[in-house]
């Protein structure tokens, strides 16, 4: 019984290990949720307003923030990758801006740390539906 149980447990944990390794090796956030019409409009609006999201691919809060937008809207955002080993990393810019945590939003020259709901982001940027 023990001989069967140990390989079985190893096999059952393998997909999670492969999945985690795969995401880690991506070096970028992988957003899977679908966008709404409103989230796409908001993303396009914040680009025009010069809003920047400072992020790190390995940051769970950054992924949570990005999932609120969905994958289509996320592609519209001005996202600066701060992780040194991230794809298109701009670590020096993040250091120059004194980014202390992720995600950090730059709105009207002000840095705001943390996950913002789409409603909060709309209010802070003046977005109207």
Report each predicted region and the residues it spans.
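Sec-dependent N-terminal signal peptides
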Residues: 4-12
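C-terminal segment of classical bacterial N-terminal signal peptides
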Residues: 14-17
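N-terminal leader/targeting and pre-domain segments
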Residues: 20-44
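Local sequence-structure signature of Cys/Sec-based thiol-disulfide redox active-site neighborhoods
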Residues: 35-76
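Structural recognition of the beta-strand scaffold that forms the well-ordered cores
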Residues: 52-55, 78-80, 104-106, 111
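Structural microenvironment flanking redox-active thiols in thiol-disulfide oxidoreductases
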Residues: 84-93
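Structural micro-motif
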Residues: 95-106
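Non-catalytic, surface beta->alpha helical segment in thiol-disulfide oxidoreductase systems
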Residues: 106-129
């Amino acid at each position: 019984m023990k001989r069967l149980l140990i390989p079985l447990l190893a096999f059952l944990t393998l997909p999670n290990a492969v999945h985690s390794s795969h995401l880690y090796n991506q070096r970028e956030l992988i957003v899977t949720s679908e966008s709404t019409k409103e989230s796409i409009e908001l993303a396009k609006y914040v680009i025009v307003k010069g809003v920047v999201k400072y992020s790190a691919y390995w940051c769970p809060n950054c992924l949570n923030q990005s999932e609120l937008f969905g994958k289509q809207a996320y592609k519209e955002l001005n996202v600066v990758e701060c992780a040194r080993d991230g794809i298109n990393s701009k670590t020096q810019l993040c250091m120059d801006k004194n980014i202390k945590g992720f995600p950090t939003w730059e709105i009207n020259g002000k840095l705001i740390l943390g996950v913002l709901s789409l409603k909060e982001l709309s209010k802070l940027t003046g977005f109207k539906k």
